[in-house]
Amino acid sequence: MSRTSLEVKAQRKPKFSARAYNRCPICGRPRAYLRKFGLCRICFRNMALRGELPGVRKSSW
């Protein structure tokens, strides 16, 4: 199936609640989803580096 059809399928209410899964709203990626931000790791990193996520900064130690 194409990515767009899978995104539409993920938005529908499943027959059983355990079947529901999260997708990144920007790219539609189903894996590496960060619940706190509602993004996948790749989109999270891009937005954080551009300064679009308030309170997020690159760690350094």
UniProtKB/Swiss-Prot annotation:
Binding residue positions for Zn(2+): C24, C27, C40, C43
Entry keyword Signal: no
SUPFAM superfamilies assigned to the protein according to its UniProt record, in alphabetical order: Glucocorticoid receptor-like (DNA-binding domain) (SSF57716)
Cofactor details (free text): Binds 1 zinc ion per subunit.
Cofactors: Zn(2+)
One GO term describing the cellular component: cytoplasm
Family to which the UniProt record says this protein belongs: Belongs to the universal ribosomal protein uS14 family. Zinc-binding uS14 subfamily.
Protein name: Small ribosomal subunit protein uS14
